[in-house]
Amino acid sequence: MDTDFEPLAPSLENIIDQETLKWVFVGGKGGVGKTTCSCSLAVQLAKVRESVLIISTDPAHNISDAFDQKFTKVPTKVNGFNNLFAMEIDPNVGLNELPDEYFEGENSAMKLSKGVFQEIIGALPGIDEAMSYAEVMKLVKAMNFSVVVFDTAPTGHTLRLLSFPQVVEKGLGKLLMLKMKLAPFISQMGSLFGMQDFNADTLTGKLEEMLTIIRQVNEQFRNPDQTTFVCVCIAEFLSLYETERLVQELTKCGIDTHNIIVNQLLFRREGQAPCAMCSARYKVQGKYLDQIADLYEDFYVVKLPLLDKEVRGVENVKKFSEYLIKPYCPNGTNETQEQDK
C-alpha cells in the first residue's frame, strides 16, 4: 500500500452529500445484510432529500421485515416519514404480473394488447423479465423521486439486471424481423374483435417505447454523477471474493462504485475479556480487513458491527443508520475504532 496515500473517511457521507445522485444500488452476496444497509442509507438520504424511494428487487422482500411494515408493488410511505417511500418488486416475474393499468392507452387496442404482447415476446429468452423491469422503471421515473435506492437481489441477479438493455435490444431486433410475417395475422385478429387500430405497429410500438425507457435509464446508470453502487460484504473469504467479482463486473459495465460496507464485525470492548470463539472470529476478520484495506485503498470503507439483536423496526433502523455516517465505537465515543492487527 502507498504510505503517502491518505485513507478515505470510513463513512457514506460522500453519498449523502452528492446532490446529483439519482440512483443508488446496494448489493452483494446473500446473507451479508444488504437490506439493513440499504434501508439505513435510505433513512439518511431522507434527511437531506425532498423525496426518497427504496425499491426491493430481491424476491425475499426483506425491507418489509426491516421496517416491520408490509410493502407492495405500489410505493408506500414508510411509517414515521413524510418523504421516504418503499416498494417491492420481483424481477423474476413477467408482464403477466404487472397491473392492467400499465397497458392502458387512449384506445381499446392497448387493453387487448397485454395478452397478445405476452404471447409474442414469451418466446424471446429473458425479454419478459426485462420488459417487466422496464415498466417498473417507467413508473418510477414518472413519480420523479429525488433519489431511488435499490435493495438488490444477490450478486448474480444484480449483474443480470444490468444486462437488461442488451437483452431488450436483441429481442427487439428479433421481433422487428417477425413483424412483417405477423402483421397480416395481427390485423385479422384486430378486425375480428372490431378494433381496426390494433396492428403490428401497436405491439412493436409498445416494445420500442420501453426500449427507449431502458436506454435512458441505462445511460443514467453509467453516469457517476447520477448513479453509484454500494457493495456490502462481511469479513470472510467467500464474501470478499464475491465483492471483488462484483466490483470488476461493475467496472466492466461502466457503473461507478467507490463505497464498500463491511458488515457484522466484532469489536473489542474495554474491560471485557472475549470468549475463545469471539477471539478466533476477531482474528479471522482482522485478516480480511487487512486485505480489504490493500485492495480498496481508493474506496470509502465503512465498518459496521455485529449486534446482539436484530435491526428491525423504524426506530432501530434509524439508530443503525447513524453508523453509516459516524463510525461505530463499542465504548460509546465518536472516535473511529480500528481492529487490532
Swiss-Prot record:
GO cellular component terms given for this protein: GET complex
Signal peptide from the UniProt entry: none
Keywords associated with the record: ATP-binding, Cytoplasm, Endoplasmic reticulum, Hydrolase, Metal-binding, Nucleotide-binding, Transport, Zinc
Nucleotide-binding as UniProt keyword: yes
Main enzyme class: hydrolase
Domain of life: Eukaryota
Molecular function in Gene Ontology: ATP binding; ATP hydrolysis activity; metal ion binding
SUPFAM superfamilies tied to this protein: P-loop containing nucleoside triphosphate hydrolases
Localization: Cytoplasm; Endoplasmic reticulum
GO biological process terms held by the UniProt record: tail-anchored membrane protein insertion into ER membrane
Sequence positions that bind ATP: 29-36, 236, 263
Pfam families: ArsA_ATPase
Keyword Endoplasmic reticulum attributed: yes
UniProt-annotated catalytic positions: 58
EC number: 3.6.-.-
Binding, Zn(2+): 275, 278
Known function: ATPase required for the post-translational delivery of tail-anchored (TA) proteins to the endoplasmic reticulum. Recognizes and selectively binds the transmembrane domain of TA proteins in the cytosol. This complex then targets to the endoplasmic reticulum by membrane-bound receptors, where the tail-anchored protein is released for insertion. This process is regulated by ATP binding and hydrolysis. ATP binding drives the homodimer towards the closed dimer state, facilitating recognition of newly synthesized TA membrane proteins. ATP hydrolysis is required for insertion.
Family label: Belongs to the arsA ATPase family.
Quaternary state and interactors: Homodimer.
Protein name: ATPase ASNA1 homolog
